[in-house]
Every structure is written in C-alpha cells, then in structure tokens.
C-alpha cells in the first residue's frame, strides 16, 4: 500500500532530523471537553503548546488518527457526495515546541514535498496570511512570487476550536492540471479541484481566550498537517481519494460482498464511498474504547453506523454486513495500528449487535410509518410532527422516512420537522451543558506557581506548610471553626482522586486548629486540593501543619485497587482478549469495573473469575511498582494501558502477579493483603458495556457470613437440613408448578363455560359480529383469556370490547379479528376514539389494544357507540 510507504518515509524523514516519533493518540481527546473527537495531529500536544505541560523532546512527528464528525469540524453529511470529504483520515505532521519556527518549518516542508512526496516543484504553490511577510519572504527562496499568494483570516488563520492555540498558517497546493479545471491560479480555483491543498503549516503564536483575545504563547511553536489520503490520491493521480489505496481496497471488498460493481459516477457509488469511509471511523473508534450510544461521542458513532447501514440497503444489504468488511481494513492498516488487529473480535461483535438492533428499529419504524402514511392519505403529506416522532421516538432516520415517502409520492413537512429538531437539540444542550462551577474557576485562577508535591506513595504523614486557602469558592487567607473550604499544601501525602481511585481523607492539624479532610482532588496539573471542614480553632496561609491520611481507609482502598487490577486480568483470561476496560471506580468499600462485552456473564463465568482472583490472592505475589519509559511500554503487549488516557515520557507500571498495568494509584504491598475477593453484582450499563461490582477483605467476608446466616434461616423456614436446601426448594417449586397448572386449567374451564353463554349475547351489523362486556374485578384478572377464548370461537368478522375495574380505574381491552384488520379496522384506533372523550389513554396494535380511563359511560352507550363505529368503518 502506497499509504504505508508514505507514512513510514515521512516519519523517518523527521526522525532523522531529531524529531521524536510519537504514537497516534486515540480518536477521542483525553480530558478536553472542547472537542468530541481528535480532529488534528496537534490535539495531543495542546497543553504543551499552552505551556501547561513539559516534555523531554522539543520536536515531534506523528501520523494521527482523526475523526471529523461532530462539533466545529464535521464532515459527516458530505462524505460520499464529494471527492475528498472523510470522517476518518490520517494526518501526517511535524511539530516544534519552542524549537524551530517558520524558517525550518518551510525548509522541511519543501524538502519533503520533493524527496518524500516526489512532487514536481514546478507544480507547487504556496499561500500565506496577508500580514505574514516573514513567511512570504521564506517561500521566495523556493518559489517564484507569482506562485505565492496572500490570503485573509478565512483561509490562512488556523485554530483548533473556539479557544486555544492558533496562529497564521501557510498552505501548500499542487496543480493537478487543466483536466481538473481551467483556473489559472488558486485564487480562481473556487472549487479547489485543480489546485489541491496537500499540507498546512501552522505557526502557533497565540492562545485565543473565551472572549476572543489573542495572547502570545510562552513559546512559538509549529504544527503541520498533511492528509495522507489526499497525498495518496495526488500521487496515484486519481480523481477522488476513494479510487486509490486503502479506500479502494475496501470498496473492492464491498463489491465482493454486495455482488455490485462500483462506478464513481453512478448513484450507487455514494453508498460504496460512505461504507468504505464509515467502517474506518467505526473500527478505529471501537478499537480505541468508544461504543455507540445515545449521548455525545457514542451518539455520533451510532449515527455514523446507521448512515452506513442505510447506504448499505441501497446495495442490497438487508442484514448485518459491516463486520464482514473489517478484516479487509485490518489487512491494510493493522500493521501500522496494532490496536486495530488486537480488537477485531470486539469491533465485529459491536458492529453486528448495533446493526441487528437497527434493523429491528427499521422494521418497527417501518410498520409505524405505514400507519402514518395511511392517516396522511388525504393530504399525501407526512406532518413534521409525525416525521419527528418517527425519528426521535422510534429511531427511524429521516433519510429512511424520505425514501419510503417517495415510494408513495408523499411529501414531508420538513419546515416543521427541522423546527422540532432544533428545539430538541436546544433542550439537549441545556440539559447536558457542563457549566464551570465557581470552585473550578477559583482553582484555575490560582497562581500557577502554587503547586503541591505528592509524597503519598511512601508515607501517610508529613510536616508541611499551607500554601493556599479557599473559602466559599473564593481565595482566602484563613479558616475559622465551622468553615467549609479547601486547603493547598506545599507537600502532601494525600492522594488526589484520579484514575478511578477516590481521593484520600484524613486530617491537617497544628496547635491552632484541625481541618478534617473529606476528599482530595486535583483540579489541574500539579495542584492538589484538600476539601473539608475546620472542626476546631483556626488556620492561616503559610502556617506549619501536619498532614495525616486516614490509614485504615487508604489501606482498604489500596487493597481494592489491586483487586481491581486482578479482576481486569481475570476477565481477560476467562472471557477473551477482546475485554477492554471502559471505566472504573475504587474506594475503601467497593470495586466497580466497566468492560467491553456483548452479553451477560453466566454464573459459571462469574464463579471462574472470582475463583481465579482468589487464587492469585492466595499466591501472595509482591506488588511491584516500576517507572519505565513509555516508549518501552508501547512495544510490550503484556502491559495494559487504557485508550483515552494520556501518558508522559516516564510512566508507572504496577506489577501484581499476572496483572501488569499502567497506573498512578495506590496499591497493596502484596496480593495476599487483599485477603478475599467477592463479586456482588454484574449487569449491563450500555450497549456492549458490562459492569462488575465487587469488594475485598473484611467487607467480602461479611457478605459471605451474611449469606451463610440467610441459608440457616431458609433451612429453618422450609424445614430442611442445610445441605438439602436446594433439593427441597426444587421439590416445592415443582409442587407449585403443578398447582399453578391445575388452577389455570380450572380458570380455563370457567372461561370456556362463560364464553359459551356470551356467544348468544353477540350482536351483528354489516356482516360483523360484536360484543361489549363488563367483567367483575375478579374476572378482569383473566381479561386476555376471555378475549382469546371468544375470538377462537368466532375467528372472523368479529370485534370485542372488554371492560373491568382495577384500583379505581376502568381497564378496557379491544380485540379485532385478523381479517378485519386487513380491511382497515384497527383495535388501537377504536380504543383511542372510544376513550378520548373521557381523558383515557391506550396503546397496542391493529389486532389488540388496551387502555384505561377514570370514567366510562354505561354499557348501553358503549354498545351503541361501537355499533356506530363499525358501521362507519365498514360501510
């Protein structure tokens, strides 16, 4: 693959010029709410550009996995319908953090263009910002002035988001010749088809704040980005990015699966392009730990998948098919991105599960759409309210609604639909908007030099000094008795909450006062904040104090954290290597671990996992902490790291028996310290995500003892020896089953006898028999039995209406024989019209519906109403 060669040669070029090759970060940013997905190579270096983080290197080069499908950079709707838009792409880049600036950046770019990309220099053009005289002068060394263009902010000022690093940029373009347009220069090339941009050099000089102010960065930096797919297309001289290399390989696989030949100019061509692109976004996102869902990134991922499925239907795919494309993707990209190869099973399982669910949604929504079409027959137009309900409530995409409506020559009230869409998005935005609370703001406003040294790995107590105090969300100089607030220490043994582990609690004290620490947090890098209340006396800044962590709670939390590591490894060994941690929480009482898995764990699975963890506890292996180079971890398959987590050059590895994980938390000294491990609960938390809750030590023993007490009580109640409880319970259950069958048989006999009487009470109109009948409250418990029995006796041309009372409300059941539903008679329509005047509500299908109402008329009136309704329906 040409892309593999280009990627490798690009990285080698910069590595040979003292750039550190840095692995691609995941396709979603870590702790950055300003963007949904990683959309540029510089995302992982944002804090370095801002001067918030330090790194051992000042030059870097990457090939970054990117997704643009949400937020400011959103290409989703264009994919498939243009020659270059993609949701997933690779961004080649080189970066300078206060090292070189414009001169070397431009010099390198020119050399790469000629020696790595093999472009003819006579066809290269450059643009610069209209105010960037320096960049213009530098390009004059390589290009004639008539091939250098000055442009405005719109084209040559770059920013990652509304806030953050930004600066002037310079773009490189390649002239593809007159067959791609008659424009004589980039200024005339409105569509950008002839003079194709292939590289953007961003000169980071500013940090844009939320009010739009441009502040000078502490260090001038360089960020460049060249889209790999676009480069491949240029070198292969294809009209679109889809006709070369990886994407064409995927299209070939889709051709094979669908039995349809790809033609770029035919309408079906868009379907091939959409699927080829979307399978990459989906696969890499899942490999990096994301899953389709109903909110934020998960929602976008689900939207991408459903868009691929909808386009797949145009190629004849009426069953899950995306998983079948994944191996072809791994064949061509798995070597460059090992996480893709390691996650094949997980990717395929998630895709198939989501597709199956969506096909069911389409079927259910399609049935509802048929009802909407029928009710809209007079206007031949689907209302915006109905279209929105089908999409919002039943998950039927508007594209699917439009296609089905087109088949019936129906229009859709898109103005109302779009208005409702906007209103829904606004409600969602208000509900999910994360507002920065006052205390967070205070922490950000603290002096940057006001940092804390953490020494809590080695000690639980130390003498230190108060560096800062916060009271009532404001910076203060003192705390008085009863005040709630926060204290910042120069040195602290308190572990701040992170990595899923709760923060420490304890005391900060001196002769003047005692501060009870309830929780410890790290609101920003280098800052540890102790939250709590002053129980007695007073404390002031600069005061010498003693910091003492609650030893018992720390020990129990550490044991649980090590237990969580053992659980994670046991899950992988029991269920398979597809297991990925999707979240965790550890405190002194419990372990909570979320992991990727598509089905509930059996009792046998849970027992095997619990047994394996306890075996490792009994082996009493020492828990060893090592600090190693992250580059060494990247080359090791034995050490677990977590997608989305950001790591520095030196990382902390926790070795606990068979478990090897990157972790910054506190741990037991040996696995035997954990004592005993017990799973307390296992359940689903989202599609493809399961959760295990567990505990260790004394808490686990208490659970076991409690269950033993329960067994003794059960044995007493059922009058059975303890070792015979299960036998006795099974015997009782069999007896209960037999009795239930006898009761059901008797009830059925009673129903049958009464139905024979009711047959003589049926009336008739328009060749249709009907019955309205009140059941007593006791009879009402068998309301469905009555309806089933009489409709079995009268299988055609029959409508029945059953009424009973329960908890002060009328319960109403309507039934319609199957042959009448084919003539347009609907049970739910009948019941809805019947209950509407009385404020009742109902739900159901064409053949059967049930509802309730606080009021109902006499049976004679209902009988008359039903008779009139049948006459109207079947006239």
Curated annotation (Swiss-Prot):
A molecular function (GO) term: aminoacyl-tRNA deacylase activity
SMART domains attached to this UniProt entry: tRNA_SAD
Q: Which reaction does it catalyse?
A: tRNA(Ala) + L-alanine + ATP = L-alanyl-tRNA(Ala) + AMP + diphosphate
- The residues that the entry says bind Zn(2+) are 561, 565, 663, 667
Intracellular or extracellular location(s): Cytoplasm
What does the entry's cofactor note say about binding and number? Binds 1 zinc ion per subunit.
- Record flagged with keyword Oxidoreductase: no
Chain's role:
Catalyzes the attachment of alanine to tRNA(Ala) in a two-step reaction: alanine is first activated by ATP to form Ala-AMP and then transferred to the acceptor end of tRNA(Ala). Also edits incorrectly charged Ser-tRNA(Ala) and Gly-tRNA(Ala) via its editing domain.
Annotated protein name in UniProt: Alanine--tRNA ligase
**Which organism is this entry from?**
Chlamydia trachomatis serovar L2 (strain ATCC VR-902B / DSM 19102 / 434/Bu)
């Amino acid at each position: 693959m040409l892309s593999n060669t280009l990627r490798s040669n690009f990285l080698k070029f910069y590595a040979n010029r003292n750039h550190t090759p840095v692995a691609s970060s995941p396709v979603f940013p870590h702790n950055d709410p300003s963007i949904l997905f990683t959309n540029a190579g510089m995302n992982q270096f944002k804090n370095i550009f801002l001067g918030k983080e330090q790194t051992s290197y000042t030059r870097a080069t990457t090939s970054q996995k990117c997704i643009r499908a949400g937020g400011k950079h959103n290409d989703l709707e264009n994919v498939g319908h243009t020659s270059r838009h993609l949701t997933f792409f690779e961004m080649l880049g080189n970066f300078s953090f206060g090292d070189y600036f414009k001169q070397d950046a431009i010099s390198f770019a020119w050399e790469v263009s000629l020696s790595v990309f093999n472009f003819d220099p006579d066809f290269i053009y450059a643009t610069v910002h209209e105010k960037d005289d320096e960049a213009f002068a530098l390009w004059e060394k390589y290009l004639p002035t008539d091939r250098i263009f000055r442009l405005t902010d719109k084209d040559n000022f770059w920013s990652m988001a509304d806030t953050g690093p930004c600066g002037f940029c310079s773009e490189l373009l390649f002239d593809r010749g007159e067959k791609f347009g008659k424009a004589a220069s980039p200024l005339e090339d409105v569509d950008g088809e002839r003079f194709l941009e292939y590289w953007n050099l961003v000169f980071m000089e500013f940090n844009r704040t939320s009010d739009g102010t441009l502040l000078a960065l502490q260090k001038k930096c360089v960020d460049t980005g060249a889209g790999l797919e676009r480069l491949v297309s240029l070198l292969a001289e294809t009209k679109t990015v889809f006709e070369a290399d990886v994407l064409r390989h995927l299209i070939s696989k889709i051709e094979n699966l669908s039995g349809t030949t790809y033609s770029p100019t035919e309408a079906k061509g868009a379907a091939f392009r959409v699927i080829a692109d979307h399978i990459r976004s989906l696969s890499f996102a899942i490999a990096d730990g994301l899953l389709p869902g109903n909110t934020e990134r998960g929602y976008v991922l689900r939207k991408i998948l459903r868009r691929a499925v909808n386009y797949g239907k145009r190629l004849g795919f009426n069953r899950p098919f995306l998983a079948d494309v994944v191996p072809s993707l791994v064949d061509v990209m798995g070597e460059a991105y090992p996480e893709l190869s390691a996650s094949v099973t997980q990717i395929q399982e998630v895709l198939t599960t989501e597709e199956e669910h969506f096909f069911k949604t389409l079927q259910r929504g399609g049935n509802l759409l048929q009802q909407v079409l029928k009710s809209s027959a007079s206007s031949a137009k689907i209302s915006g309210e109905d279209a929105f309900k089908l999409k919002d409530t039943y998950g039927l995409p508007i594209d699917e609604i439009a296609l089905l409506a087109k088949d019936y020559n129906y229009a859709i009230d898109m103005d109302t639909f779009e208005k409702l869409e906007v209103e829904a998005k606004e409600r969602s935005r208000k509900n999910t908007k994360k507002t920065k609370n006052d205390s967070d703001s205070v922490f950000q406003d603290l002096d940057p030099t006001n940092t804390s040294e953490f020494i809590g790995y080695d000690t639980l107590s130390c003498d230190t000094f108060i560096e800062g105090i916060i009271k009532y969300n404001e910076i203060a100089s003192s705390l008085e008795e009863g005040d709630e607030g926060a204290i910042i220490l120069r040195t602290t043994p308190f572990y701040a909450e992170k990595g899923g582990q709760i923060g420490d609690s304890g005391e900060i004290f001196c002769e003047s006062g005692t501060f009870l620490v309830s929780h410890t947090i790290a609101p920003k890098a280098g800052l540890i904040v102790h939250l709590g209340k002053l129980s007695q006396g007073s404390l002031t800044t600069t005061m010498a104090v003693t910091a003492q962590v609650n030893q018992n709670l720390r020990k129990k939390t550490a044991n649980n954290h090590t237990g969580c590591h053992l659980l994670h490894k046991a899950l992988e060994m029991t269920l398979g290597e597809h297991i990925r941690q999707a979240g965790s929480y550890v405190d002194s009482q419990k372990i909570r671990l979320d992991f990727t898995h598509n089905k509930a764990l059996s009792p046998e699975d849970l027992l095997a996992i619990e047994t394996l963890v306890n075996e490792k506890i009994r082996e009493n292996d020492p828990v060893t902490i090592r600090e190693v180079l992250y580059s060494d971890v990247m080359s090791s398959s034995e050490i677990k790291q977590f997608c989305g987590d950001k790591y520095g050059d030196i990382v902390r590895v926790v070795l606990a028996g068979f478990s090897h994980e990157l972790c910054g938390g506190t741990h037991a000294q040996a696995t035997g310290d954990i004592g005993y491990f017990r799973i307390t609960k296992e359940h689903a938390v989202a599609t493809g995500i399961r959760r295990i809750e567990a505990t260790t030590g004394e808490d686990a023993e208490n659970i076991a003892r409690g269950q033993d007490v329960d067994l003794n009580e059960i044995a007493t109640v059922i009058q059975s020896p303890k070792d015979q409880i299960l036998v006795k319970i099974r015997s009782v259950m069999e007896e209960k089953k037999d009795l239930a069958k006898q009761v059901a048989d008797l009830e059925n006999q009673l129903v049958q006898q009464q139905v024979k009487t009711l047959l003589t009470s049926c009336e008739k109109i328009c060749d249709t028999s009907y019955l309205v009948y009140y059941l007593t409250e006791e009879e009402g418990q068998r309301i469905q039995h009555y309806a089933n029995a009489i409709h079995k006796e009268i299988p055609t041309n029959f409508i029945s209406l059953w009424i009973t009372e329960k908890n002060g409300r009328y319960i109403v059941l309507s039934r319609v024989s199957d042959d009448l539903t084919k003539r347009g008679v609907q049970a739910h329509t009948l019941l809805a019209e019947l209950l509407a005047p009385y404020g009742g509500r109902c739900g159901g299908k064409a053949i059967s519906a049930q509802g309730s109402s606080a009021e109902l008329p006499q049976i004679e009136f209902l009988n008359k109403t039903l008779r009139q309704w049948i006459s109207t329906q079947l006239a």
